[in-house]
Amino acid sequence: MKPKSSAITKFVPVEHLDKIGEIAVYYGFSPIKSPAIIKTDLDAAKDISEGDFVDDETERHGKVPLGVEEKIALMRTYEENDWASKSQPVQLYLKDPCRGASANSKKHGCHRYADLEILGASGPIAEATLIQAGRAMLKTEGHDNVHVEINSIGDKDSMARFSRELISYYRKNINDMTPECRQLLKKDAFELLASHEASCQELNKHAPRSMDFLSETSRRHLEEVLEYLETLKIPYVINNSLIGNRSYCTETIFALVDGVSQTDKSKQRVYGIGVRYNGLAKRLGMKKDIQGIGLSLLIKNGTNDLRDTLKKIKRPIASFVQLGSESKLMSLDVIERLRHAKIPLYLSLAKDRLGAQVSSIERFHTPYVIVMGKKEAVEKSVIVRKNDTYSQDVVSLEKLAEYMKKVEKDYWGK
């Protein structure tokens, strides 16, 4: 099969993308210019404190904040541009300039973020996509042993129940607290819960856990996220002290961390923080709530060229469709295998129904479609179908990358 028109080229122009961001594109993210933060965003953020941090490893005691005003600006942009009318979810890659870096950190090379945002997706595939894409980006930068720390604070009611029990626990044990622990409790009970002080950590061993207060819906959501991690063989631990900013965070909170220093948390490097913020749109007065989740990665601007700008990317010649829960669990493995072979796909992982997936990707008119159903998931294979002749081959996952390389070469005639 050849391109029907000579106007169809192998590469398509792109803006606001760098080399490390190209990895996100393979997972369905679209690069955009980061929304400008305006006065109304800052005003809306005044009552919401800084809550999530990514450690700056060149400043052992320094931290780079992730401001809620950025999420607010993103929500405003979603509404202003009527992204709700687009195929959902909206997956975005934001290539930001230096954010929150101090003068001292600039001496060591500027620190920059890679932001991944998914708007309009409530299912656990959103968390799994962010974690898988984030780890792939960090691995490209040389971080080969990235683990996941994860927790859930549930919905608003779950968090309220947990908060009451946590404060009650600390009050009952206040006589056993060190001055440092008491000072943290005076400031905020959750500051005490997140403390790395040895005396505070000893106290927190028996503290209530947010997961024990989850609603049935929140508990099931977390279990499904963990099922993805296990299927993808991503190492993870439950971190009960991972709470985030309770003013806007909901449900899942996770961190991408250096797996080497698991035994000594005080020396552990945090490469990224991911949070859900499902209720933020309503809180900002928007008519309809927007299910939101984002991951911010701290990327070094070192001697490599990962931050070099890309002007074009490969045009996908295939779409990917998954049918059933078993294939959905394996879908990210399929994408990662093809990403390594530099085979891009059009996909819509957050949609469950076949009709919704097809309507989302059919506008691209790809000459091939890759299908994974329940049978294929069990057999670790896919069906590769030609859309003009409806001929198809069953291809094992082990041979898929090699097969698609040949298909791509034949299609472009090179």
Each PLM stretch: what is its role?
Residues M1-K414:
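TRNA-recognition modules of translation machinery and tRNA-sensing kinases, especially anticodon-binding
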